[in-house]
Each structure stands twice: as structure tokens, then as C-alpha cells.
Amino acid sequence: MALLQIAEPGMSAEPHKHRLAVGIDLGTTNSLVATVRNGLSVCLADEEGRAMLPSIVRYRADGAVQVGHAAAPFQATDPKNTIVSAKRFMGRGLKDVAYVEAMPYDFEDAPGMVRLRTVQGVKSPVEVSAEILRALRERAEASLGGPLTGAVITVPAYFDDAQRQATKDAARLAGLEVLRLLNEPTAAAVAYGLDNAAEGVYAVYDLGGGTFDLSVLKLSRGVFEVLSTNGDAALGGDDFDHRLFCWVLDKARIAPPSTEDARRLQLKAREAKELLTACESAQIQCRLASGEEVDLVVTREAFAEMTAHLVKKTLGPVRKALRDAGLAPEDIKGVVMVGGATRMPHIQRAVAEYFGQEPLNNLDPDKVVALGAAIQANVLAGNRASEDDWLLLDVIPLSLGLETMGGLVEKVVPRNSTLPIARAQEFTTFKDGQTAMAFHVVQGERELVADCRSLARFELRGIPPMAAGAARIRVTFQVDADGLLSVSAREMSSGVEASVLVKPSYGLSDDEISGMLREGMERAGDDMAARALREQQVEADRVIEATEHALAADGSLLNAEERASIDAAIDALRALRAGTDHRAIKAGIDALSRATDEFAARRMDHSIRAALTGHKLDEFQT
């Protein structure tokens, strides 16, 4: 749905003027920019008619920067200063980057995000990506004849908060106003759905250069609803290249290659992979720096066999996404293929076998994401045509919650919740007179904080002193349409408030993102048992503390035998609390409750008598 354009009366500047907005697919291997012209989404080409811009940036010693096709020839001759696949480094520390040893770059493991040393100094992946975005912005402004209102930039559905924030930072450096960060599979579904007037449940299989996502969407009368999403933020076409590169090293008995030789062979491996899409075999020929000649032939069958484990790895997220949506493969009306890597025949074959139908390939898998992003950008810019009556409902991929007493996770926003979303939940104090509360925001599917990803911490101070459990603290989670999170806490009686905009310093590791849901499923039983134990331990602590407080205040109401009975019940509960049987702890809590029933009744009577002393009965009558 188009955003409503609001202005003061008489102050609306050219209300009917078409606003220049674009969709950008910032890809690992290639990037594109698209816009809507005459109601149709089209990719914008450079002066030589090329729509795709290689995601390559070269820093030269003279201070100049080359981007795209101009930088590509220097991958082998100047590998340290020619940065390829920078998207794989966005929001990540060095330990999170796969195949570091095979890369020619001079890495610096800086706090928060890995950096690369170049002839122009240390560069972050954000700066490298900004150069690509700047080149696309300049291409768009030259093609459209004016400055851009803004851009919708696509990101993998499984990009975490740090990676999304890094993408927005790169756009700002490039002079772009970000209208929305849009998940790549969702953008593809928008392009496919509007192009084909499709309705029903569709799966989007998105295998890019560095990431994989599977999203399940329901398309109905112009509503694009994401039912579920799953994926692997460190699996893509580059991994297929790397496997073929390793095969070449093994067959040619090269170990270890020089930086320049490694880059040459990696490029030859990628060329061979692309040839195998159309041919049954491909020749890999390369002259090494030593003068040695590499001359190998790889068949399509051999390549499929050596990368079968990677294809299988994509099917895990496929199964999980369908399970989360409550669907079976036969419930899917069509499978939209996205990303150049999906052109590989054994990928097409595996998807067809799993879903029992041939995947949809009537839109260019390299361009479909940019085309969908352009459609969304056109709507968000306010260029709404009469037929543009549609709504986009995206989701959050992993649950968000808070740490509670005992190291437990209270999930506030469950995974696959529709974006944007705001969810509030009330919490209370644990101790009498508590005037502050610390909040720990976490992300993940496990029951214990130790098994989830820490996102942020903040404190709420100035809570009025009250009895334990009397204060009401309302905590609100807000996730915007870009998938970025903010959390606020407010004490309801006093109005004191604190908040935090979640900006983690680095992203989830590869295994953490792809494994969170798997671990959540596999360990659900153990997690629930651990949660039950922690809950009973916390309740035991609360009951013991409350009982001891009552004994200190009104112990004189008990005789020696009664006091001894309650003390014995407290000691027994303390011993049980140190154990691992949550049922035994629950029984101990119940036993202490029974032991204090008479004491509680006497305290109530004592309080009532104290309140009535010195007053006449008619004073309390109305």
C-alpha cells in the first residue's frame, strides 16, 4: 500500500510529480539497480548496455577507486586491493568468515567487524559496499535524469540485526536514502506475483553468491504474506566455486598456491562452474606464476557429485520453513528460483524432486530481486497507480525475548511474526523495595539465556520502592519494517522510562544463524526440563525469602513446636532446591505452604485486630 503523502495546506510541492525511486539488489557476486517506468519494473543498464554490476571494488595507489567491470580484470594481478564478495563480511568478525585461508586479503580483526588492509588504508566491508551502491546510484541518476528520492535495498532474509544495520550504513555513505530494507525472497515474490497475477502458496528458493534463503509466501488478491522463512547466511554460489577450486588443487597437486595463483584458479573454477550450466564438461586451463600449466577437464556429473553435500545443505532450511508454515511440499503451488547459482542443473533437479514439480524460471533469476525491490520502492515513494492496490507482509526470522530470573528466556516476539510489529509484556520486581531493574535482550529459540544470542542490555532506574511483585513494568519490543529492533521499559505508576536501540557490534556466526532453529527443535525436551527446574528453583527462592521475612516480623505468633516445623520445612526445601528434580522442589514448596497455612491465618487475624484497635465498628460502616 502506498504511503500517504501529508503536507500543510497549500504547501505540497508538486503533489503529482513522479518521485525517482529505485530498487537495489546488493549482491555478493553481482549488483543491480531497477526502477518502474510506465508501470513496468526494469533494470537500468550502464553505457554499454550491461545491467549487472560485478560486486568488485579495487583501491588504486593513486587514490582512485574502480568499481564493477573496471575492477574485475585485476582480481588476479592485484588481489589484495581488489575486494570481491564483500557482502560475506558485512557485520561479521574474522572468526565468522568462512575460507579465510583461501582468500588473498590482508585482514584486520577489528572490534565489531572484520576490516581489510589496502593500498589506500584499512577499509571496512561497509565502505566497500558503499562504493558499489554509489556506482549504482550514479547510474540511476544519470539514467533517470535527476536525484533519487530513495531506494529499497534488498538483504538476505536471514541477515541479522548487525548485518542489516551495516547495509543501511553503507547506503548512507553512498548518499542514498533507504526507504526500506526488503528481504530478497520477498522481493522476488513481489516481482513474480505482480508479473504473473499469481495467487496461492509459493516457495522462493534463493541461492545467491554468499547466502541461501527459503521463504514461503501466500499470494492472495494483492496481499503478499510471508508465512515462514529459513536459511543459511553463509551458503551460496561461492561455496560451489570453492569446492571446485579445492578439486583443482587436489588434481593438479598444488599445495599451497601463492596468493596470485589462488586467485587465478578461483576465477577459472567460477568460469568452469558457469560453463557447466550449459555444457556437459568444461576445461580449466591456467598458467601459474612458476610457469607450470594447469590443464584439467571437469564434467557436469563430477561437479554435481563433489557439491552434492552443498545442495543437500539447502534442503534442511527448506524442510524447516515448510514445517513452520504447517505445509507439505505438495501444498506449494510453485517454486520461484532466485539467484544466479540456481541455474546449476543439479540444483534445478534437486528442487524439482523435492517439490514434485519443475521450478518456475520465467523471470531472470539474476534480476528478479531488483525488479521486486523497484516495485516496492515505487510504492513507498508515493507513485501509486490506480492498479497498485497491494500489501506486503514480511516476517522476523528468529524469536526475540528477555532474560528472567533463573536465566530463563521469556519470548516476547515469536519467530515468523509479521513486520512491522510491536509487542508489550508486563514484568514485576523480585525483591521488596527494589528500585531498579536490568534488562537483557536476547535472540533465539532456546529456553535458556546461555543458549541464545545476546543483543543488548539496559537498566530502568527510579522504580518507586514497593513490596515484591507490586510494581508493574511494561516492556515493549518494536521491530520496524527493516527488521531493526528497539526495546523500551516503563514503570506504570511513576512513568519512569528507559529504552535501547539494539545495535549489536557484530553479527551471528554462520553456525549460530543456521543452527538456532535446528537446536531449538532437537533440544526442545531438554530445554523444557531445564526451564521447569529453573522455574521451580526461582519459586523456591521466592517462597523461602517471603517466609523468612514473615517469621522475622511476626514469629511471636508461633509456639516453639510450630516454629520448629516451619524451620524444618524451609531447610527441607533448601536441600531440594539444590537438586535437579523439579517435581521434588515443587513438592517441597507445597509442603512449606501447608506448614505455614495456620501461620498465615494468624498473621491476617493479627493485622485485622491491629487495624481495628482504637476504632468503633460504626466508623467502618457506610
UniProtKB/Swiss-Prot annotation:
Lineage: Bacteria, Pseudomonadati, Pseudomonadota, Betaproteobacteria, Rhodocyclales
Gene encoding the protein: hscA
Similarity remark: Belongs to the heat shock protein 70 family.
Record-given protein name: Chaperone protein HscA homolog
UniProt GO BP: iron-sulfur cluster assembly
GO molecular function: ATP binding; ATP hydrolysis activity; ATP-dependent protein folding chaperone; unfolded protein binding
UniProt keyword ATP-binding present: yes
Species, as recorded: Azoarcus sp. (strain BH72)
Keywords in alphabetical order: ATP-binding, Chaperone, Nucleotide-binding
Keyword Nucleotide-binding carried by entry: yes
Record function comment: Chaperone involved in the maturation of iron-sulfur cluster-containing proteins. Has a low intrinsic ATPase activity which is markedly stimulated by HscB.
